Every structure is written in C-alpha cells, then in structure tokens.
Design a protein with these regions (language model features):
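Glycine/proline-enriched, intrinsically flexible loops and inter-domain linkers
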Residues: 1-290
Length: 290
C-alpha cells in the first residue's frame, strides 16, 4: 500500500482537528474515532458543526438570504493561491503517490477566526443580502450559486487578492478555502462594511457585480475568460442513470454468548477493553478546547 501507517493517519487527523478548531475559536465538545478495515485504502473524516442564530435579524427571517441584481460581489478572508485547486474532485478520487498536492488547502485558522467575528457584526448590522463560503469550487461555486438568485454575474478575476503571482484565471476562479467567503453587498452599504472589516483586520475586495443578464461572465484584465448561460451552468449537465442489483441475504441471528459456570471473565473483559473501537478516547478528547 502507498498509504502511510494507520497510526500516523490517526494522529494526523486528531492533530488537525485539535489545532484548527482551537485556533479558530470553535468549541469541539467531543469526537468519535472508529476503525474499519474497509476504509484502509481511504480514510474518511466527517466534521459536523452546529450553529445558533436568532430567529429574526433586522425584522427579517435570519435564515433567508437572497442576492439582488446590482449587489457587489465581495470576497472576504484569506487570499487565493494554488492550494485547494480541484479539492472537491480530489476527495472523490483514489489516493496514490501521484495525487496532486495542490488539491489540499493550506488553511489559516487565525484569519478564519477574524473573518467569523467580522461576519457576525456585519450580519447584525444588515450589511449584506447573502453569503456563501468558498469551499468546494471556490469563487466558481459561491458566485455561481448566488447568481441563481439574480440570473447572472460579472466577475473580474484580476481584482482577486492573491498569495503570490503566477496564477491562471481558471486557478483563481476554482481555488477553494474555508477561511474565504463571498458576500452579496448593496452598493450603498459597502463603505460601512469596509470599516468593520478594517477593525477586525479582515481583507475584503470587490471582485464583481451580480446581474440579471442570464449569463455568468468571467473577465481577466478585460479579456473574457468565460461566458456561460446560467441555465446551462445549473441544469445543462446530463444526469446519471444508474442501475443496481440487490442481492438479498437473510440476516443471521447473532450467537448468544454463554460463559461457563464459575469461569473467570477478566481476560475477556481486558481483551474487549483493548479493542481500538472500545478503548477510551478520553485522552484525545481532553485535548480539544471545549
């Protein structure tokens, strides 16, 4: 196998969760670590987060968000680099020595924490109409999703802040990161939003505008890099037609464990407690910043 030893992977996953969440100020109350031989080739890490928010904000339902034509496309948080490119597709592929390193995001938990505080204050002051993260697909996903509300968008990629020079337009558009968000901001509210961002030391940049043209228009230094119909973008791909065969197997009843009379079960108990899926994980959990 080209995979690192399971122990190394396990320690790396735990360290990543511990460091990232502690530094970004998000409480981690627990966690579950389960071992199954069927996942030896590709371990899975699931992270679930629960958030609390008021039922209403500024007299409107807090859960409702809708970008409007004429709103500014504002990118906030971390800068764009070659890391995180094709991360969404990378997660669904077989891992091997030739897997692209650039698919892995190089995160910045401190930037994420500052951005979180900035967004909460901007939210309470009703300074944006909609917001979406730059996770899978980066700007292509966040802008493309919110442009459904308005029926189009125009993006100027040369305005996107970069970690370094040398990125192609398509790389700028799809690079993904968790500490980067896209906001739909009314033009008259941008200056106040910028003041709050400066207080929290968060970089925000106008990278385009939502339109109602029916097209997603992507430009780089006034050169058109992409011009896609919104209808095609969201509904143009053919759908898979999958077939499956169900091999029914009747569930066999579990054998009942009946110990011999007056037998000493201490060794059985110790063996059970020594199993990786039963043994206590308290030492690991206590390292999380509750």
């Amino acid at each position: 196998s080209t995979q690192p030893p399971s122990g190394r992977i396990c320690r790396g996953v735990h360290r990543s969760v511990k460091d990232r969440r502690n530094e970004s100020g998000i409480p981690v109350v627990n966690g579950s670590i389960y071992f199954d031989n069927r996942y030896l080739g590709k371990p899975l890490v699931f992270c679930g987060t629960g958030g609390l928010m008021p039922l209403e904000l500024n007299g409107k339902p807090s859960w409702k968000k809708e970008a409007k034509a004429g709103d500014l496309i504002v990118m906030s948080g971390g800068r764009v680099g070659k890391d995180g490119i094709h991360g969404a597709t990378f997660s669904s592929e077989e891992l091997h020595e030739g897997s692209p390193v650039t698919a892995v995001q190089i995160g910045d938990a401190i930037v994420q924490k500052r951005m979180l505080d900035f967004i909460l204050e901007a939210r309470d002051k009703d300074l944006f109409n909609a917001i979406t993260d730059n996770g899978a697909g980066g700007l292509s996903s966040s802008v493309g999703e919110m442009a459904q509300d308005t029926g189009g968008a125009r993006v100027n990629l040369e305005k996107v802040p970069l970690k370094y020079q040398g990125l192609q337009p398509w790389e700028i558009f799809i690079s993904e990161a968790q500490e980067r968000m896209t906001l739909s901001v009314p033009k008259e509210k941008y200056e106040e939003l910028k003041k709050i961002a400066d207080i929290h030391e968060v970089e925000i940049t106008i990278v385009g505008e939502y339109t109602n043209t029916g097209y997603l228009e992507i430009y780089y230094n006034d050169i058109r890099a992409a011009y896609l119909e919104m209808e095609f973008l969201h509904k143009g791909n053919p759908k898979y037609k999958l077939e499956a065969v169900w091999n029914y197997r009747e569930k066999q009843p579990e054998k009942e464990f009946i110990p011999a009379e007056k037998s000493n079960l201490n060794h059985i108990l110790l063996d059970m407690m020594g199993r990786v899926n039963i043994a206590s994980k308290e030492d690991w959990v206590r390292q999380y910043d509750h």
